[in-house]
A protein has these predicted regions:
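RNA-contacting regions in translation and RNA-metabolism proteins
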Residues: 1-185
Length: 185
């Protein structure tokens, strides 16, 4: 059994309307969730396939870091799917610096975050003081590198070029998990 702590304001998302989301996670990941809504602690116990069960705590953590339940459940699509977090706070000197860096990661009208998703195929969420990433290893690496470049002060243009390059590399390796608006893969 593993214990995962998530923010209070994400407990409702984890449980879902009438407990629907919680039941879906339990069924898909073959785990049992015991949620303490008082302190945000979630006990995750594997009840079925241990390999799927290992993804249970990651799914809960991903929802806690701002992902929708559907995005978090992508972790079960394939054994290679990863969940990673970039700590914006650790790369910041103070609150104002963190706000500025968060703004750089989001971009004007959310464009930078959108481009990270479009060019890599990963899901990217900025919540609180973290940037969360869900995707295949190459996708996660590309987003993490782009985020670190932006946090280190690289110009947006250079980061977009880097992402285009990674996109083309993945495409040539046949690893393009590109998703198009409308939900068709």
């Amino acid at each position: 059994m593993q214990h995962v702590k998530i923010p209070q304001d994400r407990i409702g998302v984890l449980i879902g309307e009438g407990g629907e989301t919680m039941r879906e996670i339990e069924a898909e990941a073959e785990v049992r969730l015991d949620i303490d809504s008082e302190n945000g602690s979630v006990a995750v116990e594997t009840v079925g396939d241990p390999v799927r069960g290992l993804k249970g705590p990651e799914i809960v953590r991903a929802i806690g870091r701002g992902f929708s339940p559907d995005e978090a459940l992508r972790l079960l699509e394939d054994d290679m799917m990863l969940f990673d977090v970039v700590d914006i706070d650790a790369a910041s000197r103070n609150k104002n610096d963190m706000k500025r860096k968060k703004g750089r990661l989001i971009g004007e009208g959310g464009r930078t975050r959108e481009l990270m998703e479009e060019l890599t195929g990963a899901d990217v969420v900025i919540y609180g003081s973290t940037l969360g990433i869900i995707g295949a290893p190459q996708e996660v690496d590309a987003v993490r590198s782009a985020a670190e470049m932006l946090l280190d002060g690289a110009p947006h243009g250079a980061v977009y070029s880097f992402l285009e390059e990674k996109h083309n590399e993945m495409k040539h390796q046949g690893l393009e998990y590109h998703r198009f608006p409308g939900g068709q893969s």
